[in-house]
């Protein structure tokens, strides 16, 4: 494993001299625009494991993506190698269809401290809830970014992340009531404490999310990648392309339904992913909004 290979994978060619916020942001943005958030291994007969060497080989050599435990673990390793003050945290993701936070800690986060200020660096959420810049860990402060306005709120040592979105313009009216569309203007994303975590704390969750019939990830094949002006997502056979602030305070969301024979080419053309095994797309209704 080496940093040169990782940066070749993400296309980052900037300076590595300073462990500052500007460099961190640039490295982070290259990661989220090159490495998809995806769970395709589950739906093509592969097992997801959390050994760093396996994650590195999958993302850097095989040019795949991963979910939070893979993306953020790899990014955390990179930042630590560069000399950043880096640690892992664990979050409980909000389920909009149950209107409740998960009871299992399934989301791995990176915390970075720069000149005494703490930032959350999360390269593993995907779709419109994917931050584009590290977020300062302060309570009650609106932090506007291209995807929308993010905000942390702290209550009794628990931190909550929420996001305010823009209106959405959907040209294909057949999808105007899609269950993939978020209806609320303000959306809870996840909650977490500042207790340091290790990758080993997520071993049970990694197996559970791949195997449980109750897991979102067994119900939907997901591949999503941030672009320079929005993001793409392939959920089952449904391809969406979102452009942020297409018009004032409005995002453009385009929907297409793919045929089986179009999925493989779309993964290659839109997400730069080539799978070694045959993907079996799945999209059980509910449980997930983009």
Swiss-Prot record:
It comes from the Eukaryota. It comes from Gallus gallus (Chicken). This is Arylamine N-acetyltransferase, pineal gland isozyme NAT-10. Pfam families: Acetyltransf_2. It catalyses: an arylamine + acetyl-CoA = an N-acetylarylamine + CoA. Belongs to the arylamine N-acetyltransferase family. It is an enzyme of class 2 (transferase). Its EC number is 2.3.1.5. The active site is at residues 68, 107, 122. Keywords: Acyltransferase, Transferase. GO terms for molecular function: arylamine N-acetyltransferase activity. Gene3D superfamilies: 3.30.2140.20.
């Amino acid at each position: 494993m080496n940093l040169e290979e990782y940066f070749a994978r993400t296309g980052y060619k900037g300076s590595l001299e300073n462990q500052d916020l500007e460099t961190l942001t640039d490295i982070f943005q290259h990661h989220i625009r090159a490495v998809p958030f995806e769970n395709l291994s589950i739906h093509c007969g592969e097992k997801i494991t959390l050994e760093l060497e396996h994650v590195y080989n999958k993302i850097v050599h095989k040019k795949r993506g991963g979910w939070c435990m893979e993306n953020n673990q790899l990014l955390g390793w990179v930042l630590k190698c560069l000399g950043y003050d880096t640690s892992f945290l664990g979050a409980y993701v909000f389920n909009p269809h149950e209107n409740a936070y998960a009871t299992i800690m399934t989301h791995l986060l990176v915390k970075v401290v720069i000149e005494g200020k703490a930032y959350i660096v999360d390269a593993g959420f995907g779709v419109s809830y994917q931050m584009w810049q590290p977020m300062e860990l302060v309570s009650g402060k609106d932090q506007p970014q291209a995807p929308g306005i993010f905000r942390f709120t702290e209550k009794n040592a628990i931190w909550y992340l929420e996001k305010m979105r823009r209106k959405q313009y959907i040209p294909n009216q057949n999808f105007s009531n899609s269950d993939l569309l978020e209806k609320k203007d303000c959306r809870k994303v996840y909650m977490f404490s500042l207790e340091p975590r290790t990758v080993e704390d997520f071993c049970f969750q990694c197996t559970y999310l791949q195997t449980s019939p109750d897991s979102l990830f067994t119900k939907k094949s997901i591949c999503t990648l941030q672009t320079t002006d929005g993001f793409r997502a392939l959920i089952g056979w449904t391809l969406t392309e979102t452009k942020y602030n297409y018009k004032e305070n409005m995002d453009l969301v385009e929907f297409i339904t793919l045929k089986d024979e179009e999925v493989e080419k779309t993964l290659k053309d839109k997400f730069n992913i080539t799978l070694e095994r045959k993907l079996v797309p799945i999209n059980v209704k509910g449980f997930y909004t983009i």
